[in-house]
Every structure is written in structure tokens, then in C-alpha cells.
Amino acid sequence: MTAGVAGNMAFNGLMQLGRGQQPTARDLLLPPGNIRRIAAQLARMRGAAMKIGQLMSMDTGDMLPPELADIMARLRADADFMPPKQLQGVLNDAWGVGWRKQFAGFDVRPMAAASIGQVHKARLPDGRELAIKVQYPGVARSIDSDVTNVGRLIQLSGLAPPGFDLGPYLDEARAQLHQEADYERESTYLTRFFELLGHEADFAVPEMVPELTTKNVLAMTFVPGMNIEDVAHAPQEVRDRAAERLIALMLRERFGFEVMQTDPNFANYRY
């Protein structure tokens, strides 16, 4: 991941030295060419590296140049798709070779791809539309090494503030990512939230489809909606209503349900 970035840094450094300037590692990393390289590499890695890129775009966006924040923001919902042959193999392992017979329709083109897996739309014979999340092969095994590689890139680039101890942050990232890769655990919490909120008018929670859910495939009913970030461009009353509901939900989770959805990725919310 660092080879192309390092080459571009070296070239830019020589150019600046030729102009009598004294470049820093951070200055050399931030030109748009390097930013695009980093974003593209993170998207292709499909695992912990891309997840950390997502967190960078949300958690440190105000501390980074707009160019870096904007490009990293693409990682919130976009990534390289799994090749069709690889997808077929994963679903054969999860559901058996004749899995297509269970569906009235299954779109092999993913609706979205993110850090841990990609999502496909499907339809059951009874008419229910589903969202099927398929985990990338080997992603759980690559978490530790990917987090280490991204940590090295952050240190090389000088993106971390002076004196900032990156180690505990990376340790926590590893722990959380291993939890996210556990789809059976996620299905348990999704079922719990459906029990708590699934029948309320103010919220729409997908319902689990347990007969199609495995350790690396998560099946749920499809709930249409717009990106929550697009609400920023809606009329004021719509923005107020969305904010009120989100704040009320957070308070109910903390003081009523005693269980919270703590992944801050905005791609997890629709309106």
C-alpha cells in the first residue's frame, strides 16, 4: 500500500527541494495524487484498512485538509466489489450449490460494498424483498495485519498529532472489527432492535431472516430510504424531525433499552 505513495512523496520532495523549499512528510503526503492513491488502496483492501479509512473521514475530518476529508468520505459506502465467481463460491459454501432455487430473484450486482462485506438485493417467492450482506472471504483473518499496515501509514505520513499514542487506538480498532466480522453476533442484536423498535411508526428496523443467515452471510428484510446525510439539504422541518428522532433514540438506548448501536458510520442510517 505504501510503495506508490512513497514514490510520489519522493518525487514531490525533490521538486520542492529544487525550488528551495523544506518539505515535511505530512506536506508530501497530502497532494491530491497521494490522497487518491491512499483512498484507492484502502478500497481494494476490503478489510480493517478500509474501516479505519472510514473512521478517519468521520472522526478527524475537521483536522484534515478538505481534499483528504472529501476523498476519504467516499470510503463510507463505496469499495471494490467481489468478483462474481468469488461471490458464487461464498454463497455455495453458505447455502449449498442450489441456493438460487430459494429466491424469486437475486441481483448479483451489489447495492453497496463496504469494509467487511457487500450487500445484494434479493426477492423471496412470497414477495418479500431482502438485503443480503455477504462477508468478504478471509476478511476476519486479515484484520490484525491490515490494522498494523494502516497504523504504519499513519505514522509515516505524520497524520497523527505530535506525541499521539496510536497503539491503544489500533488495539481498540482490532477488537471492534473482530466483533463486526461476527455476523451471528450482529444477527442477535438486529433481532433485539427489531423487537424494541420494529413496530414503531418513527423507526424502520430490518427483520432478520434466520434461515438464510450464517457466520458470513446476513439476511434481512430490505428497508428503502435515502442517505441520512442527504437530510442536510432537506427543509428545516425535516431536518429538525430527523435530529429529534435520533436524539430521542440515543436516550432510549442508553437509559431504557440498555443496548446501543455504537457504529458511527453514517452509512448505517437511512431516512
Predicted regions and their residues:
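Broad phosphate/nucleotide-binding scaffolds in NTP-utilizing and phosphate-metabolizing enzymes
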Residues: 1-253, 258, 270-271
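Catalytic-loop of the protein kinase fold
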Residues: 259-266
